[in-house]
Structures are given as structure tokens and as C-alpha cells.
Amino acid sequence: MDIQEINQSSPEFLYQMLGRLEVDCLYYLGNGGRFAGHLWAGNEREQIKLMWMIYRRLCEIGAAPEWMSEQQINDFAEQMLVV
């Protein structure tokens, strides 16, 4: 998924996708044994990058999710060693 696809997607889809990416991160850090194959994007860096792109797009269109914050994405990045 690239920035063009993100910009063309509905807010509903972006919420769903961001939620999916969050759940993948939680599983990766927990029962997933830190296996990158469990991540939608296939690796840690791309997963976090995609989360940022979606989050920023939602903020741009005035639809920032109440259940996700910049700090949470940063925390995932630190825990997944991509900072």
C-alpha cells in the first residue's frame, strides 16, 4: 500500500487498516514471537511506516482516531526496534 492508495481510500477503510496493523503489532510483540511474517507489511520498518502514513492521512482529513496516538505508534516503533 502506497501513499496514493492511502489518499484514495475512505476513512472507514483507513480506520480498519490501522486497526489491523495495530493488532498485528500486538501479536508480534506477544504470542507471535517477534516473527515479522505475522506483520501485514512483512517487516517491522514497513509496518510502522504504513501506520504513520495512515495516521497522518486521517489527521489531515480531520478524522484522527481517538483510539490511536502518535505516542502509541512511537512506542510500537521502539518496542519493535525500528527507531
What role is predicted for each listed range?
Residues 2-39:
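N-terminal acidic leader/helix
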Residues 29-31, 51, 82:
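Extended rod-forming repeat segments used as scaffolds/tethers
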Residues 22, 44, 83:
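Functionally constrained cores in energy, signaling, and assembly domains
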Residues 35-79:
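Short, charge-rich amphipathic interface segments used for partner binding and complex assembly
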Residues 1-12, 65-67, 75-83:
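Short intrinsically disordered terminal tails
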